[in-house]
Curated annotation (Swiss-Prot):
This is Deoxyuridine 5'-triphosphate nucleotidohydrolase. Pathway: Pyrimidine metabolism; dUMP biosynthesis; dUMP from dCTP (dUTP route): step 2/2. It comes from the Bacteria. It comes from Nautilia profundicola (strain ATCC BAA-1463 / DSM 18972 / AmH). Disulfide bonds: none annotated. Substrate binds at residues 62-64, 75, 79-81, 89. The gene is dut.
Amino acid sequence: MKLKIKKLNQEALIPAYQTKEAAGFDLHSIEDVIIKPGERKLIGTGLAFEIEFGYEVQIRPRSGLAFKHGITVLNTPGTIDSDYRGEIKVLLINHSNEAFEIKKEERIAQAVIAPVVQAEIIEVEELSDTERGAGGFGSTGK
C-alpha cells in the first residue's frame, strides 16, 4: 500500500513511522495554536493525501497528549476517505482546566491506515432473533 502525500505548505512536515512495527505515523501542526479549557480547534497539517482505493486513514489521539494534558481528538477515530483530496486537519479538544499551547511542528495526532469494507445495504421488514435481542448499554453484564 502506498500513501501519496502532497505538501500544501512548504513548511509542513512529511510524517514517518517512528518504529519498525508502529501501526501509526504522527501528524504535525502547521501553526502555533492555543486551545483553551473546553475549547475545540481544527488544526491544519499543511498536507493532502492520496489514499489507495479500499483504504482509509484513521486519525487517532496521541496517548501522551491525552494522558499528560487532556488533549484528544474529538471525533475519534476521524476518517479520511480515499476520495478526499483536501488538507488533512485534526479536530482537537482540551479536556483539562488549563489552556494548552500547540507549537508549530508539534505532533498532534497519529494516523493509521485501515482497510475499508462497504456492505450491501438491504432494507428488511424484520431482523433475525438473537439471545441478546435489543439489549444494549450494559445489558450483557454489571
